[in-house]
Amino acid sequence: MRVISRKILRDFGESHADSCDALYDWYRVSSKAEWQNLIDVQQIYPKAESVGNFTVFNIKGNRYRLIVDLVYVSQRIYIKYVLTHAEYDKDEWKNDPYF
């Protein structure tokens, strides 16, 4: 799959250095994947879940949440947000018009 907005991962990694390796691992795996549906995603990331129109990944043992828009037909992943668990729990990201 083609990952769009990788800059969001890099920027988050700069302010949360302990996330860098886990985010890079997710990027490496996801960019080589050919997922067709959430079940395919969950074979690699069992805790990935669909929330609204987004897919949410637990990163670094659930310390961070990666929120993406997976478009299976075009094989694209649009990175929307990377949040700490506390930021995720505030649900402000759910104000995204695409949610």
Regions flagged by a language model, labelled:
Residues 1-63, 71-76, 86-99:
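Basic, Lys/Arg-enriched alpha-helical interface segments
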Residues 79-83:
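Catalytic Cys-His active-site segments of thiol-dependent hydrolases/isopeptidases
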